């Protein structure tokens, strides 16, 4: 594929990933059927990428419905992904580059697409039973991060108003939605009441609203690792939890927070 075409395709995929992070509906607004569908970014609308897209969407749905992120790396789920089409009710494509002029093969062959896959709930529930899991029917929490972040400059506390926190806010919301949850970034007024300051994050307070979970932590980029290093704390159902991650990128650090909340809220034994 010509270099110019490759550049356009990579650019479109980057835009698609950003849109995917914010386009999903609120998890609290979702009904159970919405949890049984997922969207992946694939190349073209033929069979080259469809099996991979189906497998990715099946994995995502199994995790969302059960609340068990450990299924992501479960070898049994990887094997099920080889036959994911057996559980599909319907699927559809949307051209990521719709409205962008055609550039070489991108017009007919290599254009990236959103592949949205809907699975049969009964089949998914049966698969979960075979995996030793059950559908999580409880109300899903809203994740509220109380975080101090630092890369090269001085640390800062992520707030709803912070101008240079836009990327972090979008990333955190997108990672929550990947797992069927929602996020709410606290205001500066809330953070002041909680006693949060750059580099100094207190124990997580009781959430101000029902069905919210406050996760306290620090996230710092360390060249010696290299990568982001984060540590998190939360209190849920009278128990304190602490976990963390190191040597990952920005998005994966936020995923680690969401996975921990997901496991605990869905009744599993801990954030890891």
Protein language model regions, located:
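Signal peptide-directed extracytoplasmic domains
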Residues: 74-147
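N-terminal Sec/ER secretory leader and immediately downstream segment
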Residues: 35-85, 89-98
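Bacterial N-terminal signal peptides
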Residues: 11-21
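Amphipathic beta-strand/beta-sheet edge segments enriched in Tyr/Trp
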Residues: 36-39, 113-116, 120-123, 207-260
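C-terminal/domain-edge helix-coil "capping" segments
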Residues: 33, 52-56, 60-67, 119, ...
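A short, hydrophobic beta-strand-centered structural micro-motif
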Residues: 89-100, 145-147, 185-186, 195-230
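N-terminal segment of the mature soluble domain
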Residues: 55-79, 139-198
């Amino acid at each position: 594929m010509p270099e110019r075409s490759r550049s356009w395709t990579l650019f479109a995929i980057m835009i698609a990933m950003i849109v995917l992070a914010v386009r999903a509906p609120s998890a609290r607004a979702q009904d159970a059927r919405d949890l049984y569908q997922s969207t992946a970014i694939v190349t073209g609308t033929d069979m080259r990428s469809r099996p991979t897209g189906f497998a990715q969407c099946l994995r995502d749905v199994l995790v969302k419905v059960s609340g068990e992120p450990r299924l992501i790396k479960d070898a049994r789920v990887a094997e099920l992904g080889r036959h994911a089409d057996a559980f599909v009710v319907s699927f559809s494509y949307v051209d990521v580059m719709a409205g962008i002029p055609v550039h070489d093969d991108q017009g007919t062959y290599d254009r990236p697409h959103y592949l949205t896959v809907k699975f049969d709930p009964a089949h998914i529930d049966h698969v979960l039973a075979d995996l030793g899991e059950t559908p999580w029917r409880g109300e899903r929490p809203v994740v509220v991060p109380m975080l101090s972040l630092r890369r090269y400059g001085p640390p800062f506390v992520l707030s709803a108003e912070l101008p240079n926190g836009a990327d972090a806010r979008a990333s955190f919301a997108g990672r929550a939605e990947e797992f069927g949850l929602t996020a709410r970034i606290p205001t500066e007024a809330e953070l002041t009441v909680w006693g949060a300051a750059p580099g100094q994050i207190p124990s997580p307070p009781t959430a101000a609203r029902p069905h919210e979970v406050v996760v306290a932590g620090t996230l710092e980029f360390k060249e010696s690792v290299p990568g982001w290093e984060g540590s998190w704390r939360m209190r849920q159902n009278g128990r304190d939890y602490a976990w963390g991650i190191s040597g990952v990128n920005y998005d994966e650090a936020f995923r680690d927070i969401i996975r921990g909340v997901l496991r605990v809220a869905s009744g599993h034994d801990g954030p890891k």
